[in-house]
Amino acid sequence: MNINKIALIYNHNSKHLAIIEEIKQLYNYCKIEEAEVIIVIGGDGELLHNIHRYMHLNIPFYGVNLGSLGFLMNPLDTKKLLQNIHESTVSILNPLLMQVEDTSGQIYTALAINEVSIFRKTNQAAKFRIEVNGIERMSELVADGALVATPAGSSAYNLSASGPILPLESNMLCLTPICSFRPRRWHGALLLSSATIKFEILNTNKRPVNATADFQEFNNITNVTVKSTKDKPVKLLFNKNHTLEDRIIKEQFGG
């Protein structure tokens, strides 16, 4: 990948400003709108926020990890930064499109790179009905919540909720309950990425529920519809010896 114009994004309150200044001195940068690659320095959260902010530009993102986990990031190598970008591999992520309706009848939409999650708002467990492609698959799930994860997001919140990790090219989605009470033995489902999943919230007055698409939260919802969309693909760049697919495989073996 031959790259000449790069943009740099970082948190100006970062505790790593000395390292960031070193990177700034080594390379020339342009405005984000003129860039061929957007470099995001920080952690997964910083990268996700900026993907949501700039994904409409259809410019590849290259993350440099100065956070803790950095699953979607590349290791820091200031001297070889440009070389690593030139030699990088591209992973295409298709986000989830979430549509929610709240108790006032307002309808909202949002995109998620990792997952869409719904969860109880009070100490009362949530109750909801689940449809897949217009067919009722579960008349009542009683749980703290549930989530739908992409392959890229399957190793994040989904894994913590005991969901499976999906290979990046699997064209699948994870539907995973969060602390399921009834049915107690239900551990979720693997669905084709073409599936449309709908959650209808039951007893919303007594058991209010919120929904999130990555970090965007919506309160007091009555139903949620989730599906994958190929209309807004996100390109992530990874070092050739540190690909996202390799990391997903490694995570499955306790790496």
Swiss-Prot record:
Its EC number is 2.7.1.23. NAD(+) binds at D44, G45, H49, N114, E115, D144, A152, S155, A156, Y157, N158, L159, S160, Q216. The keyword Disulfide bond does not apply. Its cofactor is a divalent metal cation. The keyword Nucleotide-binding applies. Keywords: ATP-binding, Cytoplasm, Kinase, NAD, NADP, Nucleotide-binding, Transferase. Its main location: cytoplasm. GO terms for molecular function: ATP binding; metal ion binding; NAD binding; NAD+ kinase activity. One of its GO terms (biological process) is NAD metabolic process. InterPro entries: ATP-NAD_kinase_N (IPR017438), ATP-NAD_kinase_PpnK-typ_C (IPR017437), NAD/diacylglycerol_kinase_sf (IPR016064), NADK (IPR002504). It comes from the Bacteria. One of its GO terms (cellular component) is cytoplasm. The active site is at D44 (proton acceptor). It catalyses: NAD(+) + ATP = ADP + NADP(+) + H(+). It is found in: Cytoplasm. Involved in the regulation of the intracellular balance of NAD and NADP, and is a key enzyme in the biosynthesis of NADP. Catalyzes specifically the phosphorylation on 2'-hydroxyl of the adenosine moiety of NAD to yield NADP. Belongs to the NAD kinase family. NCBIfam families: PRK04761.1. This is NAD kinase. It comes from Rickettsia africae (strain ESF-5).
